[in-house]
């Protein structure tokens, strides 16, 4: 009976936490009967039920995520690209063109580059405008080297006057990311559905050598001294990744050759130096149809960059684009020490000579000055010198008059004493 009381609460908890499982019926034993079921078995059954419930919850959660992703915008875009690929493939097949699906991938890549050409043009215009303003930016950096706050304000004012938005080049790149993801999903779905089974020139199959998530199982480990797909197929599949890495390096070299003087561009080039190797490694883990798309897209992007940099004109006034010089209308602020002219002893001597013997001022002599700032300072120094001379002459006259009055007073007193004595 004690065992029955111990089982009832445990089964009650199980019913509360796991409603999907039916409750175990309680078996009433007769008087004198003893339950032989150990407690460990009861705990094991509870753990099995909990594990089963966790697995059910995990499957349900994964199903919900799959349902949400299936109707998302990226999935809709991927389905649209799949439809375009299928339409192009059928059209090329009806025209009796061999390797129809490979040429359909190339045609889709060209259509996408044409559709995103305005965004690419906007990006190149923004990049060229920023490059044209680099001399002024460097001038501001040298001028406000110890004042980052004013440097930021003056740089923002410069961009505003030139009508340039530094972030404008990022928006076209961000806008093309969903397109790339949609194309990637479309080609991945085509490979999973077996639509990329045909080859393309030397490539045995556009769906090979691996599937999504298959990794490098087609290349390693070796079996009987050869890759799993054989040496001939492995060499054929490796040609496209090698071409992709080479084209990526050539594209970086061509595009970055015009920006070697920009330190920020040099730093970015050093960081992106290993990007082609990463892309090449990734191309070994996906179907060859995706590698073909990346290769063609890379060639078209390089051609677009060269064409736009040769044809796009930057509309920035020369007064804003060129650095400030001595002959320009932009004033150059000089240090205070250069603006104030020091008065020399020779100039003070010439000012003293401009007075006659009676201390009266004579006609002023014209003094040559170097700059307007120095003339104003020397004029003020001359005025203060003349005021000092007048003050000293006045004091000398007062002292002479006082001495004369003292002497005359003493002489008058001595004569009065003589008269009294007489």
Swiss-Prot record:
Keywords: Chloroplast, Membrane, Plastid, Thylakoid, Transit peptide, Transmembrane, Transmembrane helix
Sequence intervals crossing the membrane: 65-85, 97-117, 167-187, 226-246, 276-296
Acidic residues: compositionally biased ranges: 358-367
Residue numbers spanned by region Disordered: 1-22, 325-422
Residue intervals on the Stromal side: 86-96, 188-225, 297-422
Membrane topology: Multi-pass membrane protein
Biased composition regions of type Polar residues, renumbered to the chain: 1-10
Principal location listed in the UniProt entry: plastid
Molecular function via GO: membrane insertase activity
InterPro entries: YidC/ALB3/OXA1/COX18, YidC/Oxa/ALB_C, YidC_ALB_C
Ranges annotated as biased composition (Basic and acidic residues): 334-350, 386-400
One GO cellular component, as annotated: chloroplast thylakoid membrane
Transmembrane recorded as keyword: yes
Membrane topology, Lumenal segments: 118-166, 247-275
Keyword hit for Disulfide bond: no
One Pfam family of this chain: 60KD_IMP
Biased composition (Low complexity): 368-380
Top-level taxon of origin: Eukaryota
Subcellular location: Plastid, Chloroplast thylakoid membrane
Similarity section: Belongs to the OXA1/ALB3/YidC (TC 2.A.9.2) family.
Function text: Required for the insertion of some light-harvesting complexes (LHC) proteins into the chloroplast thylakoid membrane. Essential for the assembly and activity of LHC I and II. Its function is probably partly distinct from that of ALB3.1.
Name used for this protein in its record: Inner membrane ALBINO3-like protein 2, chloroplastic
Organism ancestry: Eukaryota, Viridiplantae, Chlorophyta, core chlorophytes, Chlorophyceae
Gene name per UniProt: ALB3.2
């Amino acid at each position: 009976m004690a065992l029955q009381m111990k089982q009832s609460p445990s089964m009650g908890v199980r019913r509360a936490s796991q409603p999907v499982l039916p409750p175990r019926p309680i078996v009433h034993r007769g008087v004198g009967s003893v339950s032989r079921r150990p407690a460990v078995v009861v705990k094991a059954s509870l753990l099995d039920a909990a594990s089963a419930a966790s697995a059910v919850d995990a499957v349900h959660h994964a199903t919900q995520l799959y349902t949400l992703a299936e109707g998302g915008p990226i999935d809709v875009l991927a389905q649209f690209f799949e439809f375009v690929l299928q339409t192009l493939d059928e059209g090329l097949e009806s025209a009796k063109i061999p390797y129809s699906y490979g040429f359909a991938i190339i045609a889709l890549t060209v259509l996408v580059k044409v559709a995103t050409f305005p965004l690419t043009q906007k990006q190149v215009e923004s990049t060229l405008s920023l490059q044209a303003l680099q001399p002024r930016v460097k001038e501001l950096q040298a001028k406000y080297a110890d004042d980052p706050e004013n440097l930021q304000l003056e740089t923002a004012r410069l961009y505003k006057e030139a009508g340039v938005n530094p972030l404008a080049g990022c928006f076209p790149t961000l806008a093309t990311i969903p397109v790339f993801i949609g194309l990637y999903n479309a080609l991945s779905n085509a490979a999973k559905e077996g639509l990329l089974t045909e080859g393309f020139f030397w490539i045995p199959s556009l769906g090979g050598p691996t599937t999504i998530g298959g990794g490098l199982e087609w290349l390693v480990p070796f079996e009987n001294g050869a890759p799993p797909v054989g040496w001939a197929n492995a060499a054929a599949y490796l040609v496209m990744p090698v071409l992709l890495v080479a084209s990526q390096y050539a594209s970086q070299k061509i595009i970055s050759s015009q920006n070697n003087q920009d330190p920020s561009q040099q730093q970015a080039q050093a960081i992106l130096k290993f990007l082609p190797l990463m892309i090449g490694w990734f191309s070994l883990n996906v179907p060859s149809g995706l590698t073909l798309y990346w290769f063609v897209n890379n060639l078209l992007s390089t051609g677009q960059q060269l064409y736009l940099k040769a044809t796009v004109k930057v509309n920035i006034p020369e007064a804003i684009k060129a650095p400030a010089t001595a002959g320009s209308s932009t004033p150059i602020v000089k240090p205070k020490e250069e603006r104030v002219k020091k008065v020399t002893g020779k100039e003070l001597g010439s000012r003293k000579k401009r007075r006659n013997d009676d201390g009266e001022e004579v006609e002023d002599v014209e003094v040559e000055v170097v700059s307007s700032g120095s003339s104003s300072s020397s004029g003020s120094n001359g005025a203060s010198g003349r005021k000092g001379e007048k003050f000293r002459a006045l004091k000398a006259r007062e002292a002479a008059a006082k001495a004369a009055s003292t002497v005359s007073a003493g002489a008058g007193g001595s004569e009065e004493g003589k008269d009294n004595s007489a």
